[in-house]
């Protein structure tokens, strides 16, 4: 796929697989699993003005779940955002065919419903890694995440979990996907004579 002019996008494992396919490496994050809300993701210098982040705040939170992370950048990689948990939260990889790859470590495609399901699925693992201290805690957190789907989200919930527009507003939360379509896919499509 990288040898074609087709633009590619991937989140989480998508970024990791693309990194390895392009010659970089991935490792288990020594800080453990980043899960729930990835905090204070900051657009890097190279990310300012990049198509992925048009209309996105300079520092934002995002729904996330990952244990692995990019360790060594592949040749032709530009880091677009970072945070204290993982130095590569988003990247662009130049590809031989010119289509390019844009990827995020976090999940702009997730809603609170998806991350709530992840908490239920990983409950025992989260307790083992001391992200929760008692067995019922992950399951108890799930209804709170479902409640965040309401518009507007309940104010006590917003305060308790430190949620803001970047994760609560679907248009802001998924902006990277729309930007990729508008900034990479549609221009590539039009160069192929497709409207």
Name these PLM-found stretches.
Residues 3, 43-195:
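Amide-donor transfer/coupling interface in amidating biosynthetic enzymes
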């Amino acid at each position: 796929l990288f040898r074609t002019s087709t633009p590619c996008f991937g989140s989480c494992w998508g970024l990791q697989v693309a990194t390895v396919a392009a010659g970089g490496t991935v490792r288990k994050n020594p800080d453990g699993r980043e899960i729930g809300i990835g905090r204070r993701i900051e657009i890097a210098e190279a990310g300012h003005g990049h198509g992925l982040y048009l209309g996105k705040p300079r520092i934002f939170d995002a729904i996330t779940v990952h244990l692995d992370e990019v360790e060594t950048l592949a040749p032709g990689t530009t880091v677009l955002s970072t945070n204290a948990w993982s130095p590569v939260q988003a990247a662009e990889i130049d590809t031989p065919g010119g289509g390019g790859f844009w990827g995020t470590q976090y999940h702009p495609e997730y809603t609170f419903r998806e991350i709530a399901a992840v908490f239920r699925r990983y409950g025992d693992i989260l307790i083992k890694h001391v992200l929760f201290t008692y067995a019922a805690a992950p399951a108890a957190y799930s209804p709170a995440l479902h409640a965040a789907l309401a518009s507007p989200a309940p104010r006590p919930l917003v305060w308790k979990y430190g949620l803001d527009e970047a994760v609560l507003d679907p248009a802001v939360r998924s902006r990277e996907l729309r930007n990729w379509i508008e900034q990479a896919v549609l221009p590539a499509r039009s160069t192929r004579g497709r409207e």
